[in-house]
Amino acid sequence: MRILYNLLLSGITESFSSGVTFQYSAVASMFISSSIFYFFIAHILPVNIVGSISLLYAIMNIMAVVFVFGLSNGIQHYLSYHLVRENHSAIMRLMRQTIAFSVLLALAAFIFMFLASGKIAMLFFHSSAYTLSIKLIGIAIAGSVMINVFGAMLLGLNQYKKYSLIYIFINIFTYFFPLLMLFLTGQSVYLIAGLASINILSAMLFLFFVYRIYGRLSGLQTKSVKEPYHNLIYYSIPLFFSSIMGTSATYIDRIVVSYFINLSYLGVYNFALIIASAAAFLVAPVSNLLIPKLSTFFSLDNKEGFRNSIRILLNIVSLIYIPAALGIAALSRILLFEFAGKAYTMAYLPLIIIMFVTSIFIGSTVLASGISSIRRTKIFIYSSGFALASNVVLSVILIPRFNIIGAAIAYSSMNAVNFTIVYYYSRKFGVNNYDISRIIKIWISSLIMFGIIYTIQGLLPYTMINIFIYILGGLLIYLVEIKIFRLINQEEMGYIISVIPDRFGAIRYLAKSLAYNEKKGNYDRLFRFIK
């Protein structure tokens, strides 16, 4: 019976390593598609129209989080928790209830945006001409609510490959179909209509795969276990408030820019944030995959392996993100000039500020996932609330005086505030396990690379070819530093190698040669499990 169960379960769960590979593919597709999208609209449309589109996307992201009601994190955790315990009846009941609830939330989102469209247009766009666009973005928000919840259900069931493949499809069409509508009609309102259409179709695609998994679960042996839905709601409520505050904190500076200054400055500032996201895509998949796997270890009550493995993940995230962010900072001016145009180069200093500050506090990605996995989600209300307050206060004070530089400082402040609170509670709950000496060595190596690249790019002309030369040069410098400063050991490198396909044998060999040998410890239990 156990063998039969494993065979059936193999069609439901997937390996963490393959999940990481596909998650990176999905996030890379989003970054590439969005970069191409904004590249074209920056060269086709006036700066103020680019700013209005950026503001519409910001409204969509904020309102989608509001109407998701925290369900995406809640259902992801509870499905993972019951999956490892083979409580399939509880899983199926949670899936049915969550699907129905998410559809109701999506309808509520559309109705709200439809009724409030006129007031939103006058308040933030200073023109009633945007009323139709706001109504259309209401449809996109409804689709986004369902996408987030249905996608979280696939992640909770360890369906990393399916989730990622669907998101690759969504990312491509979410940006290219609206762009096609813009090319065909020449009117930006059709771009928003294209986005709304794709979001609804994408939600239906996610729902189709969720129902397929539901059908497979119905054929498995199950235990008679019930999970009261109010438990999931109680788990989700703190995440609901923290998500609202966290997302609002992320976008509030853009809203303040549009309110106090104008949409043209918002278009310029938004492009700096788009380039800043290039480094974020390197660690975003880690957060998506950590919660289900750490929730599994919480279910198995393996506290030692859980905490000590946080150390590995903190080291890997820092090793990848910090040099990437500082590399972008070094090339900030040339990137803005080549990808957006001369009018956007004023955003280079805000971009440098954002890259350095986010690098300092990037560890909060891992620590927050660890805290979520042990069901201590209430603290995210504090962290998100104070982050929002910091961004609001500094935005109102600094943006009228310093324009987008003030916006960058306000935006960056929320990273510092959020990290401070998350770090405090991660120590309190026994989640934190920073390797301070390793992080310092990574910073020294990254700063050396930053100094060299920043100096050289200031001496040579701005060309696209030179950008690729600088990127290659920075990568080579950092690879040498990894070896010299002993920035990663064999155990940690084994985790990275495990997500590199076998056909890239040369890359796997190079990666292995960069790592140093360390006496094998007892801290890599999660690492061995997720492989």
Identify the function of each model-found stretch.
Residues 1-34, 89-96, 131, 210, ...:
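N-terminal membrane topogenesis motif
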Residues 8, 12-13, 117-137, 263, ...:
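Interfacial segments at transmembrane-helix termini and the short loops linking adjacent helices
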Residues 12-77, 101, 110-114, 140, ...:
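Signature of the first transmembrane helix
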Residues 143-167, 189, 355-386:
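Membrane-interface junctions at transmembrane-helix termini in multi-pass inner-membrane proteins
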Residues 2-16, 189, 206-250, 289, ...:
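Interhelical loop/hinge segments that connect adjacent transmembrane helices in multipass membrane
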Residues 32, 387, 437-491, 495, ...:
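Transmembrane alpha-helical segments of multi-pass transport proteins
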